[in-house]
């Protein structure tokens, strides 16, 4: 289309207002500075998401007190208005409560996905519209491109910084309003731009932690919000043997090996890993590494960004590549629609896949376009538990 600016929007940059979500880090600061340099009417917004008093001096986490100050200084430096919005209450309800509930249910949550889904790309997007913006821009490393049926989500040029796993829940409506200027840049290029522009945050380290966990110990937050989640229980082997006691399933995640609480009175001949958490029985179930391998995932709450309605997915399934953890590369798979969600069958087994995590879909051709994803509710183990005698039975699934 003709008459579009660099953000794929109609009109001149100076006539186009863009709200930039500024976290105080290098990436969002470069995003704001680039758009300002290109002539856009830029407004910076920073969200205060959790207790400001507890976070003022903490560094290395998104939206901490120091980060709010950094965002304000960058906005002043590049000459744009900047606002801080107090979203503590809605963040608590939408993200922190879900985080605690997930751990109490024996899941391993991804709070960054929930934050993008329920706060940044919903409430902040509405605020941007209220301010008369034509788009909300962020510093995420992901690409948004015009497709035949609307905007599409694609993996970024810098695959080492690929954040598509955390943005799979972005809806089509949100995608039409969002822009990701760093999608075609690498992280070193973004830092070089920050240096060239003289931004104060050019050398600031990347955020690493969950923003609302001040000590890095997530169990502290879970126990505070859901005290009953720390109820003790048994550590049980897949073969039924009780090997020890634990002080609460919130202290464990799928794939964990250390700190299992197995007593010396129950010697084991092989390394054991957490393969399932049963919140109803308050059991931590352990087994060999092989029991962590899975090729079949059951998903709920599907967000579909592919062509055509998800309900019209072919009965023989759709060839895709799937990503089951943020740190793992996508693997070939097949996607099947079910009455309540979807099933993904992996062509290669993956280990340590936990309920509560996401399975993200990419196109089966080049694996670059994001087709959506869903939340893992159950995995089916590839391993079988040897019984006494010669028969073998399937290991229980993690759910």
UniProtKB/Swiss-Prot annotation:
Localization (cell): Cytoplasm
Cystine residue pairs: 115-211
GO biological process: tRNA wobble position uridine thiolation
Gene3D superfamilies given in the database record: Adenine nucleotide alpha hydrolases-like domains, HUPs, Translation factors
Keyword tRNA processing: yes
Coiled coil: none
HAMAP family in alphabetical order: tRNA_thiouridyl_MnmA
Listed name of the protein: tRNA-specific 2-thiouridylase MnmA
Organism phylogeny: Bacteria, Pseudomonadati, Pseudomonadota, Alphaproteobacteria, Hyphomicrobiales
